[in-house]
Amino acid sequence: MITEERILKVLRAPHISEKATMAAEKANTIVFKVAKDATKKEIKAAVEKLFEVEVKSVNTLITKGKTKRQGLRQGRRSDVKKAYVTLKEGQDLDFVGGAE
């Protein structure tokens, strides 16, 4: 079983974009930025435990960081791993969670 500490380190932040919003509305899919070494099983367990929902599937991808320059200096942004988490029918994820 996955430890409580590991569950808290797997999910970094929700990924907010136009594509993520469309996926949430049409396919009941939520997009998260996750730890690079996180597995699909860990992501599923973390979402189910933290948000108390049932997960249907998890798809992951790694976006490569862009090369950026400022004058003569050149650097590179970090790679980011994203997880598309599809929830089962009738399940809804509320980020606010009862805040008033």
Curated annotation (Swiss-Prot):
InterPro entries per the UniProt record, alphabetical: Nucleotide-bd_a/b_plait_sf, Ribosomal_uL23-like, Ribosomal_uL23/eL15/eS24_sf, Ribosomal_uL23_CS
Chain segments annotated as transmembrane: none
Coiled-coil features, chain-numbered ranges: none
Annotated Gene Ontology cellular component terms: ribonucleoprotein complex; ribosome
Alphabetized PROSITE patterns for the sequence: RIBOSOMAL_L23
Domain of life per record: Bacteria
Keyword Metal-binding: no
Molecular function as annotated in GO: rRNA binding; structural constituent of ribosome
UniProt keywords, alphabetically: Ribonucleoprotein, Ribosomal protein, RNA-binding, rRNA-binding
BP terms from Gene Ontology: translation
Subunit architecture: Part of the 50S ribosomal subunit. Contacts protein L29, and trigger factor when it is bound to the ribosome.
Primary role: One of the early assembly proteins it binds 23S rRNA. One of the proteins that surrounds the polypeptide exit tunnel on the outside of the ribosome. Forms the main docking site for trigger factor binding to the ribosome.
Family assignment from sequence similarity: Belongs to the universal ribosomal protein uL23 family.
NCBIfam families hit by this protein: PRK05738.1-1, PRK05738.1-3, PRK05738.1-5, PRK05738.2-4
Protein name in the entry: Large ribosomal subunit protein uL23
Organism of this sequence: Vibrio campbellii (strain ATCC BAA-1116)
Highest classification ranks of the organism: Bacteria, Pseudomonadati, Pseudomonadota, Gammaproteobacteria, Vibrionales
